[in-house]
Every structure is written in C-alpha cells, then in structure tokens.
Amino acid sequence: LAQAPFKITRRASREQVSILREFVWLQMLNLGQKVWGIAVSDAHTVFGNGVGGWRTYIPSSSDEPEEIEWEEISRRAKAGQMMLTTGPFLQVSTKDGTLPGGLTRANDSLSLNVGVQCPSWIDIDRVQVLINGRQSSEHNYTRIKHPELFQDGVLKFDQQLTIKLSQDAHIIVVAYGENFDLKTGYGKSSQGTNKPCAYHNPIFIDTDGDGFTPNGDTLGFPIPTAKMSVNAVKEQLSKLNTPTK
C-alpha cells in the first residue's frame, strides 16, 4: 500500500534510496508485463531472526500432504494462482470462479468474493481493493468506518463486492492489519514489528471483448532506475507531496 516506488532510509548516519518492489510490480503490470508475485523468506541468525516472515499459498485439490501432487502445484503456480501473506489467509475469486492470475469478462461491473481468515494471535482491520494498481477510495473497507463488514472470529471478512469498471483492469485485494503487529509470533525478532498483510496476484478483467489491455499508468512516478540519488528521489517525492521517509 505504498504511495511511491521508493523511499529514503538511513543506514548508520547515511541516507540511502530504498526501492519498494511491490509498487514497482504494480507499475510493471500496468505496462503489460505479466510478472507473478511470490513471497519467500529466510533466516540469517539463530536468535532474534524470525523464520517464514512471508509465505506463498497455492490452491490444492487436497489438504492431505501425502495427496498433494507437484504437477498440480506447478501448474497453478505458473498460472499465477498465488496468495502472499505474513499471516492472514486471503481468498479472492470472481463470481464466475476466476482465481488470481486468471482473465475474466465483465461489462461495467465485477462481482468479487473476498474472504479473510486469521489465527487468534493476529487480526486485520482493513481490506483495500487496488484497481490497476491504484487504491480505490470507494473500496477501502476499515473496521472503523465499516464495522458491519468485519467479524471477530477466525473469519474476519466475508463479503461479495461489486467493483464498477469503465475500462480493462487488473484487480488486487489487500488484507491489512493497520493497528496490529506480529510480535506474538515473532517475539524479539525485528519481524515482530511487521503488519499482518496478505495480497494476491492480479485478476485481469476484459471489459470490451478483445482481451486485457494494460492502461500504461506508472502511478505518478517513473520506473525506478539503478543508482538513483537521494536528492533526485527527494525531489520526486516532494513534487507529489509524498513523505520522503
């Protein structure tokens, strides 16, 4: 849910440019580059370094480990049917059953089924729909403004949303815990300060019957390049009233 493809961070006493890959990914999708998102994680020390900060979920015909077929997992992964998460379990599909990575046909609106489940030690309080990479104000659901849409059990959110469309689009849903963290699971690890977050690969929508056409929108910023200077990034952020840090 970043507002720019980069930010200024500090390492020791020196400022540096950090690229926000998720934002760049959205820019790439708008330029027609179908790159699937996948989450990976590792550990570098035994103490104080959480393991499995991000995970990737892929649908399977069976929940029994011995019955899971690698051919099916490979096929679904190549099709982009993946959900990325730090904990929340997000499921999104269209009314006709199209999953992330798929292409479906719609006229002026799309029915989207969105479900979010969480274990007892984490929670989410926001569900945001991205339409062509931009955060839709109409589809920004929070516990504060839309308490009737959220629940307190394992199932946190279970709604069918109607998304109005005027052109071809790719849709991504983000489930987020703005007022929560992962400290219960990660303890003293720095990953404990991360937020519960889940999102999925885009669902592509064809509104005019000629397939999906990307809109070319780079979301207000040029695609980041290597060795961008701190001053150049600060200048770009200041022009759009975006915080530099």
PLM ranges: what are they?
Residues 9-12, 22-245:
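C-terminal functional module detector
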